[in-house]
Structures are given as C-alpha cells and as structure tokens.
A protein has these predicted regions:
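Short, acidic loop-to-helix structural element flanking the phosphoryl-transfer center
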Residues: 131-160, 167-173
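Structured segments of extracytoplasmic/periplasmic soluble domains
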Residues: 82, 86-93, 114, 118, ...
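Surface-exposed patches in mature extracellular/periplasmic domains of secreted proteins
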Residues: 90-102, 157-165, 186-189, 236-238
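A solvent-exposed, charged loop/short amphipathic helix patch at secondary-structure junctions
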Residues: 119-136
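Second-shell loop/turn segments in exported
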Residues: 64-74, 131-139, 160-165, 209-214
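Asp-based phosphoryl-transfer active-site loop
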Residues: 101-114, 161
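C-terminal cap/substrate-recognition subdomain and adjoining C-terminal extension
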Residues: 3, 30-38, 170-265
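Non-catalytic pre-domain segments flanking phosphatase-related domains
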Residues: 2-105
C-alpha cells in the first residue's frame, strides 16, 4: 500500500536526512513505519525541506528535477561508492566459490526518479495519473543508479529488477530504463512486475489468478526467493528506496536509497 506524504509525514520527516546501508549491521536514517504517537511534522515545512534536500528546480518545460549538487545527490553518491566497493569484492568471492552472483533493483525512485509526479500531485497518489506518467516513459534517472547497474554487469553479476509496477506498465518501464541508461537485462526473465491476472506459482501463498493478496514484502521477498531457489543465483545485493523493497530476506546485503516523498508498506 502506497501512502501519500500527508499520511506518512512523520515517517518521511525522519527519512529526509538521507539513506544508508540497510540490513547489514549499519543503522539507517529513517524508519520502517510512521510514528503517529505525537503531533506530526508540519506538512508545509516538510515540503520545503524536501525541496531543499532534492535541490528541486524546474527546467524550461516546467519539469521538476533534482539538482546534481543537492544533499540528495551527495547521499546517493556515498551509497553508490560503498556499493561498488562491496560488489567488486562480493562478486569475486562468489565466482571463486562457483556461485552465480546477482543483484536486484527496484525501479521507481531507485532507478527512475518520480519527483516531478510527486510535486505536481502534491505528494498524493492516483492510479490513473500515475499510469499515464509511467507510460510516458520520460522520467530521469536516479543519480548514479544506471551506472551502478552497468557496474554490476561489468563484474559478471546478473542484474534483475523487482518492481511494484504492473504488467500493463512493462513497455513504459523498459523504454524509460533504456532512455535512462539502464539498458541491461530488460527482458521478462529478468524484470519481475506484478501480474495480478496470472500471478506466478512461486507466489501461490498469497496470490492466485484474479485474487492478489500479497503485501509488498511478500511479493518482493517471494520473487527474490524464486531468483535464488528456482533460478539458482545468489543475490549479493538488493537496492530499493522503500524498506518494503528490502525486508523479507533473500539477499546478502541491502541498500536503502533516500526517498522522503512517499511510503510503501
């Protein structure tokens, strides 16, 4: 379930400072659930803080973009640098053991930035406008993420994608990832999207044709389990902007990218 800024303001306020290595012994900047036991952070001030964090500017066409010298970009650069060091070592170790190393990337706000949509829609979600936005296939890349995809591939690491986007949004996602520079393994065997009409057998514990009861964690961790147990890979790293992208195991290490604009439980 995706919660708007208004529904998750308290949690987002804690996350605005950035992101961190998650699930590997290092505490993250943020929290996995909103805390509503006290007066929430003021929304007007939070929006200003978000603009400052992203260094939000509008281009000549009025599209809202993040600044490459913003605190957001600097947080991403730190995460990417650490991840590259880790991937280099972990890939060599896995290959030495005869394992098949893999990485998993979320798409929305992990590879493709949705800041323009969030700002235009006052940080609220609507399925129809979101679908139009995704299928327009014109989102900019999250700073450094396409380079990280290509870096993993260069180290002999198999790249997979695990997204909450739907099968109906596949063409838009593929076109946008190509445009953004993440043109690696964009086939259906490597990009896992939600198929509520015909869910895969490995999700039978929470989804059957026509009935989808999977939480985000069940869907994403179940897909990672499939990659490891059925496809025979060892997921050495998992990247996402939501804690629900990362929870549930089936990855040696997880990286939480910053996103203070919405919360997916």
């Amino acid at each position: 379930m995706r919660k708007s800024l208004k529904a998750a303001a308290a949690g987002a306020a804690c996350a605005v400072a950035g992101a961190a290595l998650y699930g590997a012994g290092v505490a993250g900047a943020g929290q996995s659930a909103a805390n509503s036991t006290h007066e929430p952070y003021n929304i007007g001030q939070l929006v200003k803080d978000i603009d400052t964090y992203y260094g939000t500017t509008a281009d000549a066409d009025g599209v809202y973009l993040a600044s490459p010298d913003s605190p957001y970009a600097k947080d991403l650069a730190r995460i990417d640098a650490e991840a590259e060091r880790y991937l280099d070592k972990a890939a060599r170790t896995a290959h030495h053991r005869g394992a098949r190393p893999a990485v998993v990337f979320d798409i929305d706000d992990t590879l493709l930035l949705s800041l323009d949509y969030e700002k235009r829609h006052n940080y609220t979600y609507d399925s129809a406008t979101w679908n139009d936005y995704v299928n327009k296939a014109d989102r900019p890349a999250v700073f450094g993420s396409p380079e990280l995809v290509r870096y993993a591939e260069s180290k002999g690491v198999e790249v997979f994608y695990n997204s909450g986007l739907t099968e109906a949004q596949r063409a838009g996602a593929v076109a946008n990832l190509k445009k953004a520079g993440a043109d690696v393994n964009l086939d259906a065997g490597h990009m896992f999207l939600k198929d509520k009409a015909a869910p895969p057998a490995y999700l039978k514990h929470c989804a059957v044709p026509g009935t989808w009861n999977c939480t985000t964690v069940q869907y994403k961790s179940g897909t990672r389990r499939h990659i490891e147990h059925d496809l025979g890979y060892e997921i050495i790293a998992n990247f996402g902007d939501q804690y629900s992208d990362l929870d549930g195991g089936y990855a040696d290490r997880a990286y939480k990218l910053p996103n203070p604009t919405y919360f997916v439980s």
